[in-house]
Amino acid sequence: MPLFYNTNPFIFFKVYKYKIFNNLAEEGINVLAEAKYIQDDSGPDALILRSFPLSSEDITKNTKCISRAGAGTNNIPIDEATKKGIVVFNTPGANANAVKELVLCGMLLASRGIIQGNAYAESLQNKSSDELNKLIENQKKYFKGNELNGKTIGIIGLGSIGSLLAQATNVLGMKIIGFDPYLSVEGAWMLPKEVQKADSLEYLLSNSDYITLHLPLTKDTENFISKKNIEAFKIGAKLINLSRGRIVNNEDILTALDNGKISTYVTDFPTPDLIKRSVQNRGVILLPHIGASTKEAEINCAVMACEQARNYLENGFITNSVNFPNIRLGRTSKFRLVIIHRDEPGMIVKITSEIANENLNISDMINKSRNENAITLIDLATEPSQKLIKCIEKMRKVVSIRLC
């Protein structure tokens, strides 16, 4: 979904500071290239990062938003940010195609003896041409695999990545079972009509040749795949996990590999035990967390993260926040109040009453809430006084207020 900058004459010049953690694609930094943006580590308005483990010390009193160039936000102290009225963004979908393509690659690696075949071919480096031909023809039977066409893939999580994967595997002639109890209407529209939506996780697990996970890491999804549901897998199923390592219980997976319940485990999250198993060439294929590591994905994530931070700082717009609701209001004046507060009855009346007491006219306003948190955008016909801003700021349940 494209994001738009407000370039109308209502915008007045204000300088914002931002701090970047990790390396960020230049295309993203260019979004903040105007004179009103300064890269400054002292009291930045916006923190922009990829996988950097953000701590409480990185958050200052001036921090207004944190923008993650990527989907996962388990490296950000979200609860603390929310209490302080700091909006946390991520970039769902920006790296979806990159992950989708690597899942397809993982499925092929798990099916065709590609890695083993390559290792064998390299072991023949000192053989003559005649010897090579004989050896290859004699040994290739050991690398015989299976095709994807006609097999069943179970996709757990039908968001941006899951829906793209469903489209791709449908073209490959696979049967598709999807499971996502939180599937949105928008997500449903992206799915091919051939996708069979499972009523239960057990149904998907027991009917899928390939199972691929596309879930965020939360308290509810940690050890999502473990002994208790591995029992439901088809014998010899292949599991692909490019989401988060802790979604899968590795100890239980190794046991399932030993007893043949699972034939192959492909994951982007190596551990010492998994590496040991992979070196032994016993059903584990490891990748060094490269699911989103493409030039295109890094650019998409960086641009999206910086655009979201910019739109929030300049206009109070929120898109793809993990802790506050989406909100957008077209500008009707150059004086906009952005108020973060708890979602309680009477808050709007209290705020607007104070504005009325100052004889200020409200041009337009909007209020949105998510769980116990809310944000209100108010456009004023004339500039509010610092006295009014301080008065609203001191209200019970108001977390922060700013003029943008």
PLM-predicted stretches and their roles:
Residues Y5-T91, S206, S226-A232, N249, ...:
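An N-terminal-biased, well-structured beta-alpha scaffold segment characteristic
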Residues S55-E57, P181-R277, S293:
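Rossmann-like adenosine-cofactor binding region
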Residues K84, P92-T152, N320-V322:
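Phosphate-binding beta-alpha-beta segment of Rossmann-like dinucleotide-binding domains, i.e.
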Residues K100-A119, Q167-M174, V303-F317, T352-A356:
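Oxidoreductase and adenylate-handling cofactor-binding alpha/beta cores
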Residues L158-G159:
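Glycine-rich Rossmann-fold phosphate-binding loop(s) that bind the pyrophosphate
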Residues G162-S163:
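N-terminal Rossmann-fold NAD(P) dinucleotide-binding loop
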Residues G236-R331, I375, C404:
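Rossmann-like dinucleotide-binding domain for NAD(H)/NADP(H)
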Residues T319, N323-C404:
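A conserved regulatory-domain signal marking ACT and ACT-like small-molecule sensing domains
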